[in-house]
From Swiss-Prot:
InterPro entries reported in the protein's UniProt record: Glyco_hydro18_cat
Catalytic activity: Hydrolysis of terminal non-reducing N-acetyl-D-hexosamine residues in N-acetyl-beta-D-hexosaminides
Organism annotation: Palythoa caribaeorum (White encrusting zoanthid coral)
Protein name as annotated: Beta-hexosaminidase
Temperature behavior of the protein's activity: Has maximum activity at 45 to 60 degrees Celsius. Inactive at temperatures of 70 degrees Celsius and above.
A molecular function GO annotation: beta-N-acetylhexosaminidase activity
Domain GH18: 1-32
Enzyme nomenclature, EC number: 3.2.1.52
Alphabetical keyword list: Glycosidase, Hydrolase
Length: 32
């Protein structure tokens, strides 16, 4: 989601990084 505590650009990059980390964790769990 978007964070009102950050500039829009940083919030967007943060969301992308967060989504990537969550996706990696998800696949890591499936790989077990």
């Amino acid at each position: 989601g978007k964070s009102s505590s950050r500039p829009l650009g940083d919030a967007t990059l943060g969301d992308l990084d967060f989504d990537i980390e969550v996706t990696q964790d998800y696949w890591d769990d499936l790989a077990r």
